[in-house]
Amino acid sequence: MIHAPVGIVTLNRYSHFRKCLESLEKCTGAAETEVFVALDYPPSEKYKEGWTDIDEYLKNKEADNGFKQLNVVRRKCNCGVGKPNGNWELLEKYLHEHYDRYIFTEDDNVFSPNFLEFINKGLEKFEDNPAVSAINGYCHPYPFIMGN
């Protein structure tokens, strides 16, 4: 199985980010997965504490983690989100240019232990199907009507 790299963008939500990364680390296939974290620079002082906590946490995780490789991009200025050359856009552009597939997530997701396996199998299964443009690991609790 091909293990797609994972991209995570973050800024200052330390507790959310830590849960996200640690749940990803517990996934089947994590040891074969490259992870790219893009830590944006705080736009103002009110974001500095959470940003510093994430930065310190990542310094420790870079040295000791359960991934094939943990790559951290520390932005030197605030890139923002949802605008040209924003933190999200820059990381996605890098992954798109260097890999034929990738997994992108927010920093507040907590993953099931089979998440990576599920997504990677889906990416392989539908690789050549032009009708499929993405594999999703979330299902909104929609009130399905079960019939006979």
Give residue spans per PLM region.
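Short, well-formed alpha-helical segments that are part of the catalytic scaffolds
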Residues: 13-26
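Alpha-helical scaffold elements adjacent to nucleotide-binding pockets in ATP/GTP-utilizing enzyme cores
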Residues: 20, 91, 118-122
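A short, glycine-/small-residue-rich helix N-cap motif at loop->alpha-helix starts
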Residues: 77-87
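Short beta-strand-to-loop acidic/aromatic patch adjacent to the donor-nucleotide binding site
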Residues: 99-110
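Conserved donor NDP-sugar-binding/catalytic core segment of glycosyltransferases
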Residues: 114-148
